[in-house]
Design a protein with these regions (language model features):
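Internal transmembrane alpha-helix with an interfacial aromatic "cap," most often the third helix
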Residues: 15-64, 100-107, 164-172
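Intrinsically disordered, low-complexity N-terminal regions enriched in serine/proline/glycine
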Residues: 4, 13, 17, 67-79, ...
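Hydrophobic alpha-helical transmembrane segments of multi-pass membrane proteins
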Residues: 1-21, 33-40, 118-140, 157-160
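Membrane-water interface of alpha-helical transmembrane segments
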Residues: 1-2, 23-30, 82, 86-89, ...
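Membrane-interfacial loop-to-transmembrane alpha-helix junctions, especially the N-terminal start
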Residues: 1-7, 54-65, 111-124, 173-174
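Extracellular-loop-to-transmembrane junctions of the mid-late helices
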Residues: 69-106, 147-153
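C-terminal transmembrane-bundle signature of multipass membrane proteins
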Residues: 97-174
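Long hydrophobic alpha-helices with heptad-repeat/coiled-coil character
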Residues: 60-78, 152-155, 165, 171-174
Length: 174
């Protein structure tokens, strides 16, 4: 979890400092993008580490919602921006949301401490959903003013990131 937060924070720090120092968004955004991509990779590793063998083997059709939503959104995002970056991001979000939906379905049939994983999976799904909506708002309503939907959704994303920590804490309590 620390690696997830650390990478996300470093990517955001670069972006914010560049914006404050030069009054424009970075022209070479791959520095911050590398941090953000790394954070999602660490989130997936955390998902894998927290899941049990039974959860990893659990199959449910509900998890197919992830690619059914993610693939059309990926096509939509690719019409507005860099194709490779959008394919990478959407692919990672599909994988993370697939595992969270599967984990949430598995946690619903568990009892005791195993069912506490649902808080973590709900937190991850909230993060993915807000990221998707944030990207949609960036495509449809560009701009960085305080009145832009992107600004408010970015604030909501920050709230989701903060909420993910106690959700993970509940998942790992013994």
């Amino acid at each position: 979890m620390t690696c997830f937060y650390g990478c996300f924070a470093l990517g955001s720090l670069y972006w914010t400092l560049y914006l404050l120092l030069f009054s424009e968004t970075p022209q070479v955004f791959y520095v911050s993008e590398f941090g953000w991509v790394s954070s999602v990779i660490f989130l997936h590793l955390l998902q894998y580490t927290l899941s049990s063998d039974g959860e990893r083997r659990f199959l449910t059709g509900k998890a197919l919602i992830a690619p059914l939503i993610g693939v059309p959104l990926c096509v939509f995002y690719c019409t507005f921006g860099d194709v490779l970056s959008n394919l990478l991001w959407c692919g990672m979000m599909i994988v993370v949301s697939y595992h969270s939906i599967r984990g949430l379905a598995y946690a619903q049939i568990q009892t005791g401490t195993a069912c506490k994983m649902r808080y973590f999976h709900i937190g991850v799904l909230c993060y993915v959903a807000v990221e998707y909506v944030l990207w949609i708002s960036g495509c449809l309503w560009p701009g960085y003013s305080i009145s832009a939907p992107y600004c408010w959704l970015d604030l909501l994303l920050t709230g989701c990131l903060f909420a993910l920590l106690p959700a993970t804490g509940k998942a790992v309590q013994v």
